[in-house]
UniProtKB/Swiss-Prot annotation:
Gene (name only): SOCS2
Post-translational modification: Ubiquitinated; mediated by AREL1 and leading to its subsequent proteasomal degradation. Ubiquitination is dependent on its phosphorylation at Ser-52, by PKC. Ubiquitination is stimulated by LPS.
Record domain SH2: where: 48-156
Keywords from the named record: Cytoplasm, Growth regulation, Isopeptide bond, Phosphoprotein, SH2 domain, Signal transduction inhibitor, Ubl conjugation, Ubl conjugation pathway
Free-text comment on this protein's domains from its UniProt entry: The SOCS box domain mediates the interaction with the Elongin BC complex, an adapter module in different E3 ubiquitin ligase complexes.
This protein's name: Suppressor of cytokine signaling 2
Keyword hit for Glycoprotein: no
């Protein structure tokens, strides 16, 4: 089962609960809510999280994009938080992201779910599949059995990313040992905030 949004009922402390539930006082989020909030905060820094967007709006954004271009948006299905919309060889398509027990993974049929990797954050999940697609992609050939390959290659940004973030991505692509670089500590801290290549 995936995470469902908890309905807040009543007034006062119960009504003030976060939509993801809290443990203890209204000021102190549960560990689960804190993990989820951290993952969503990280996602909001990417520049390719579009927030609330319909399926048709996502299709419109991706229709002229090259194959492999993707964006993350809020899911229109109440059992899921997020959806990946991606341009495939057959046109734009959507894939839900499942959140369960503090982990994110791609939604799939039950017999395959246990084999799919799980991640602490959505950005880590996307980064993993983008890197995997870079390693395996040899060309845009269509599969022979009628299935469509899902390639994640390039995010569709909501707006031009800040130069600082683009520099951080470039550094992340070149090294995984930020602390060995001859940079000020404050800059190293900034680089450590986002360790991904996408």
């Amino acid at each position: 089962m995936t995470l469902r949004c908890l309905e807040s009922s009543g007034n006062g402390a119960e009504g003030a609960q976060s939509q993801w539930g809290t443990a203890g006082s209204a000021e102190e989020p549960s560990p689960e809510a804190a993990r989820l909030a951290k993952a969503l905060r990280e996602l909001s820094h990417t520049g390719w999280y579009w927030g609330s967007m319909t399926v048709n709006e996502a299709k419109e954004k991706l229709k002229e994009a090259p194959e492999g271009t993707f964006l993350i948006r809020d899911s229109s299905h109440s059992d899921y938080l997020l959806t990946i919309s991606v341009k495939t060889s057959a046109g734009p398509t959507n894939l839900r992201i499942e959140y369960q027990d503090g982990k994110f993974r791609l939604d799939s049929i039950i017999c395959v779910k246990s084999k799919l990797k799980q991640f602490d954050s959505v950005v880590h999940l996307i980064d993993y599949y983008v890197q995997m697609c870079k390693d395996k992609r040899t060309g845009p050939e269509a599969p022979r059995n009628g299935t469509v390959h899902l390639y994640l290659t390039k995010p569709l940004y909501t707006s031009a990313p800040p130069l600082q973030h683009l520099c951080r991505l470039t550094i992340n692509k070149c090294t995984s040992t930020v602390w060995g670089l001859p940079l000020p500590t404050r800059l190293k801290d900034y680089l450590e905030e986002y360790k991904f290549q996408v």
